[in-house]
Every structure is written in C-alpha cells, then in structure tokens.
C-alpha cells in the first residue's frame, strides 16, 4: 500500500493513511481517458452484438442496484462496467495496469456516492453503451471524457467539506 501511495510509513513513528494526492488523481484520470477512449473505439468496430452482451448485463445489474438503493454495490459495478468494456476489447491487462494508480481517483469518487450521483453515472454508462452499439466512436469518446471528469465536481465538494483529506501542494 505504500507503493501505491495509500500508506505513509514513518519508521519509529507510525503508519498513516496518506492524504489524497491531486497530482496522482489527475495522472490516473489522464491514463484512464487515453485507455478508455481507445477501448470504446475498438468496441465501436464490433459488428456482432452478441459480443456486447456482457456490457448489457452490467447495465442491467446497475439498474437493479439503483432501484434497490444499493450504492456500495453500485460503486463496485461502476468499476466492473469499465473492466468489462476492457475485457470485451481484449485489453484487460492494460486496464489492470492502471488500476493501482487510480486509487486516489477512486477515493474521491467513494466519498461522494449519493443516490442522484449514481443515477447520473448509470445514465452516462448507458450513453456510452448506446454510442458503442451505434458504432459512433467520437460520441463515445466525448461521453467518456465527460464521465471521467465527474470527479472534478466531487473534488470541489470534498475540498469544502473535508479539506484535511487533501494533500497540500
């Protein structure tokens, strides 16, 4: 955990949870943006709609979580949706490579997981899936850019409510 900047170990003093590092947050968003836009481009080239069924299954599970107000489960399915898209595009290893550096990005997301926020995420996922099924890579890329920029709103709220969680420059 120290290697991915979650824990800060100070010999003979103690072990502490690291503050959220905004440079690492932006780095993770940057890498995810590059990867996920390329994944969506690959998926837009798929002609066999049966290959996209795992994506549809993820959306179905997310909708059920929303209907039953299961936000924690929804958070896991949010990550699973992106992982599933990577798997369909045969880019699972690439997705796993960036997974460890997105921990600070995920911390911001987790701290602001309200019901209405989950509904917005679901709608964005549905829009991404629709663009993929329409073979519209540009539209999918634009939605992904907006989707991965949601954290900025979350970050502003977090800075106001819990500034002590954020690492100073």
For every predicted segment, state its role.
Residues 1-45, 87, 152, 156-169:
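Short linear motifs at protein or domain termini
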Residues 113:
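Active-site region of PLP-dependent enzymes
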Residues 24, 28, 40, 45-110, ...:
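Conserved amphipathic alpha-helical segments that form helical-bundle/coiled-coil interaction surfaces
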Residues 117-119:
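Active-site loop of classical SDR/Rossmann-like NAD(P)-dependent oxidoreductases
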